[in-house]
Amino acid sequence: MSTAVLTIDLSALAANWRSLNALSDVETAAVVKANAYGLGVGTAASALAEAGARHFFVAVAEEGVALRQALGAGPQISVFSGHMAGDTALIRDAGLTPMINSIDQMIRHVEALPEHDFGIQLDTGMNRLGMEDGEWRAVREVATQRPPSLVMSHLACADEPSHQMNRQQLDCFVEMTQDITAPRSLAATGGILMGPDYHFDLTRPGIGLYGGLPFVDALPVVQLDVPVIQVRDVHPGETVGYANTWTATAPARIATISAGYADGLIRAMGAKARLHAGDTALPVVGRVSMDLIGVDVTALGSDPDSLQLIGRHQSVDTVAGFADTIGYEILTSLGDRYKRVYTQ
């Protein structure tokens, strides 16, 4: 088989949800946008529901429809992008809860689905999604008559607990939501770890569920093993890959593995990246190609059948570091060509 195998440990995923749930005294939801961070939303969300999650968040309404088909009736599914033009039928038919981000969305929702649940997203300083203070004041009286199912905001710097922006956003959120009776939510994974001041009525862990930072106590959820297509001897002075970026200075044994930037192993990893055969770390040589990567396996006593990129020796965040990026980008980029194997 020439397809890399992405093994997803559902028991670890569920354990991470339970661990994050134990860190607060409030309801713990689960963020499963981007196909559950690339791991397969139907299977992942079902495991999280079995662990106890009853509220899920997705990025767009289409993701919510797919999730509803996987989970069936019952769990609440909230949509971060709110009520976009053209989403009305999806929201209604799949029983989704749009997180209203603007006055225009508020008007659209009330006119199209006057009896349908909605939430509110407020901007407390990130300047991304949500109503600013003036907008919120303009619609607050109307919006809270229902009341909304949830009022939320999102922290910009929760991965840096000491950053002054966290307290600034907390204070802003408290001020903007004074005297409302609706449940409130501010914390994703990083906010959960900053303590009860940030927890309010519901937390929304995402990356921590899948084994990523800043949740350092997370169990690893993914393992990526890539098959070796071919192994060859390379002599001193010979080069490997596009643009001759790596030249052998001694006799070398080079394996070509079946994955590349089309599979989410981004080109920026380059020669910083390492793979493993057992406990032996092996360097990438030459450029990462669309479908192929060269690895120096000279240190091994025999040619390997496969090499491991993500697993017990290096996490998603370690691999992200090879490319000076974040674990989120690597995880959500892991491509459709991988064979996904789920274990319990």
UniProtKB/Swiss-Prot annotation:
Entry's family note: Belongs to the alanine racemase family.
MF terms in GO: alanine racemase activity; pyridoxal phosphate binding
Descriptive protein name: Alanine racemase
Pathway field: Amino-acid biosynthesis; D-alanine biosynthesis; D-alanine from L-alanine: step 1/1
Alphabetic keyword roster: Isomerase, Pyridoxal phosphate
Superkingdom, natural source: Bacteria
Presence of the UniProt keyword Translocase in the record: no
EC number: 5.1.1.1
PROSITE patterns referenced in this protein's UniProt entry, alphabetically: ALANINE_RACEMASE (PS00395)
Matches recorded under NCBIfam families: alr
GO biological process, one term: D-alanine biosynthetic process
Cofactor annotation: pyridoxal 5'-phosphate
Recorded name of the encoding gene: alr
Organism field: Roseobacter denitrificans (strain ATCC 33942 / OCh 114)
Pfam families, sorted: Ala_racemase_C (PF00842), Ala_racemase_N (PF01168)
High-level lineage: Bacteria, Pseudomonadati, Pseudomonadota, Alphaproteobacteria, Rhodobacterales
UniProt modified residues of type N6-(pyridoxal phosphate)lysine: 33
